[in-house]
């Protein structure tokens, strides 16, 4: 909008993305005392409105990205034409789908150790998963937690050997294998997780005040996977250090392309890069 263009932003019916379920953001520059995720998103939204961005709380049903004029069609049937499109749909953390998980999201259940680990200082917590991300999150969380129990439903791990050995060598980490999570327990906050032994069927409760789900992320690229180049997991591929995709005039940013960092500040920076790339592309294609 500051470039005197006319950006239309489709926020979806629930705007704000992953930050809307983050209780406290302490690693975003400019907020010395931290800020809640919803407050940060409200401020970003108001800033965009101040510069004239057209923000629409509508879900996008389909896109047509080929050709000089792109089109975006909403679930309500409205079609918007554009010369350039920036994709910033993000990625969604995979969840277990067990009782109590979504009800206690942000109240002891999290999918981001970097975001929320600090709030579990000197507490007993569980990390659910068996891949590299689970090992990394468990190891990271030992900086804050009194103890970390790594829960995996199988005997064998998908994690690389070095990541697994690092977790095993940490005195604060206890590893439970062949344990499936049946439910997250607690009323207003997490008090434990109910586990079922996949071999014997025995059910037990692990007393914890935090549950970090680390079973991967899925990029929200369903709308464009058939027309844009993506990696095998669905992350949109961009060219070099730019945000340009495999279609001219289409750019992608944030967690839609980033499987490594997934932080608010890196997503914001990536979005800025996409805006600059789009502005320059439009200037070159008058």
Task: Give, region by region, the residue ranges found by the protein language model.
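Residue-level detector of alpha-helix initiation sites
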Residues: 14, 91-93, 132-133, 258
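Glycine/Thr-rich phosphate-binding loops of Rossmann-like dinucleotide-binding domains
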Residues: 18, 95-96, 135-136, 158, ...
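Beta1-alpha1 glycine-rich phosphate/pyrophosphate-binding loop at the start
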Residues: 1-51, 123-124, 129, 133-161, ...
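Short secondary-structure boundary/capping segments
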Residues: 11, 17, 62, 77-78, ...
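Glycine/small-residue-rich loop that forms an oxyanion/phosphate-binding "nest" at active or ligand-binding sites
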Residues: 51, 55-121, 130
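A Rossmann-like FAD-binding core segment of flavoenzymes
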Residues: 45-74, 79-82, 142-240, 280-286
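FAD-site-proximal beta/loop scaffold in flavoenzymes
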Residues: 92, 97, 102-119, 215-262, ...
């Amino acid at each position: 909008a500051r470039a005197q263009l006319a950006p239309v932003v489709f926020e979806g019916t629930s705007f704000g993305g992953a930050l809307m379920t983050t209780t406290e953001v302490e690693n975003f520059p400019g907020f010395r005392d931290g800020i809640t995720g919803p407050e940060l998103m409200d401020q970003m939204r108001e800033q965009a409105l101040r510069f004239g961005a057209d923000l629409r709380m509508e879900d996008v049903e389909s896109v047509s990205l080929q050709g000089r004029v792109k089109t975006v069609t909403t679930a309500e049937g409205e079609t918007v034409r554009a010369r350039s499109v920036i994709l910033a749909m993000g990625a969604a953390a995979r969840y277990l789908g067990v009782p109590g998980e979504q009800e206690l999201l942000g109240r002891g259940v999290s999918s981001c150790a970097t975001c929320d680990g600090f709030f579990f200082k000197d507490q007993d917590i569980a990390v659910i998963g068996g891949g590299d991300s689970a090992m990394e999150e468990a190891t990271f969380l030992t900086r804050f937690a009194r103890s970390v129990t790594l829960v995996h439903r199988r005997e064998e791990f998908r994690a690389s050997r070095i990541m697994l050995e690092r977790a095993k060598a940490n005195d604060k980490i206890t590893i439970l294998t062949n344990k499936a999570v049946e439910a997250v327990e607690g009323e207003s906050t997490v008090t434990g997780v109910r586990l079922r032994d996949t071999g014997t069927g025995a059910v037990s409760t692990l007393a914890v005040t935090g549950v970090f789900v680390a079973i991967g992320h899925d990029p929200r690229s369903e709308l464009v996977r058939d027309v844009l180049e993506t990696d095998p997991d669905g992350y949109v591929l961009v060219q070099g250090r730019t945000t340009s995709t495999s279609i001219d005039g289409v750019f992608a940013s944030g967690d839609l392309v980033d499987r490594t960092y997934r932080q608010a500040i890196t997503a914001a920076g990536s979005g800025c890069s996409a805006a600059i790339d789009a502005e320059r592309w439009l200037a070159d294609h008058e």
